[in-house]
């Protein structure tokens, strides 16, 4: 560390693809709901265009791409329908990202922890209830809390504000762990260093994007590696 550098004090985790390996379930649920509206979404399109977006933004994008009108009432219905389907899927196929439980427990002994996600709060709570990680997080920012989706930095800035209300912390002292390009853009715009996981994109697709580190997974890594970012 160079004198004057900020030491890491907190770690902010994205949720889907970082803590829980559920992007396939989100993709499946979105595909099914859109199919009922006669809109086709391929898996390739999901990972290229929709990964990292909250459900509201995703449906707006899908209807815009299909040149279809989406009313506020229909949008609300589709978000609820997709969330219900996701919860049904994840109940029978929940899988945490490799190394996530151990990493979170270790990180919690060294840093303040938070979740910043485009998922709905009830989805986050449901998954945390199925694990023993729920008490690890001081701050949780979900899609319900925000009007702007990543890559807008608002959700990461909201997490920083929430930390500050409890005990002051510099934004630069918050390290983000993400798996999506919009998430990386949001973290950088918030002034936070970002570690990228290759859960959803190959390492070569993340090169030159401004990530502080690129890891294949959380397994085999120590939270202490974040101390000097």
Segments from the language model and where they lie:
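Asp-based, Mg2+/Mn2+-dependent phosphohydrolase catalytic module
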Residues: 1-9, 101, 105, 121, ...
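N-terminal helical cap/lid subdomain that shapes the substrate entry/recognition surface
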Residues: 5-101, 105, 109
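Conserved G/P- and acidic residue-centered "switch" motifs that form tight phosphate/ATP-binding loops
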Residues: 14, 18, 117, 179
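Short, flexible loop segments at the rims of nucleotide/cofactor-binding pockets, characterized by
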Residues: 90-94, 118, 191-194
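Glycine-centered short loops/turns at secondary-structure junctions
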Residues: 110-111, 191
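Thiol/selenol-based redox catalytic cores and closely related redox-interacting motifs
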Residues: 114
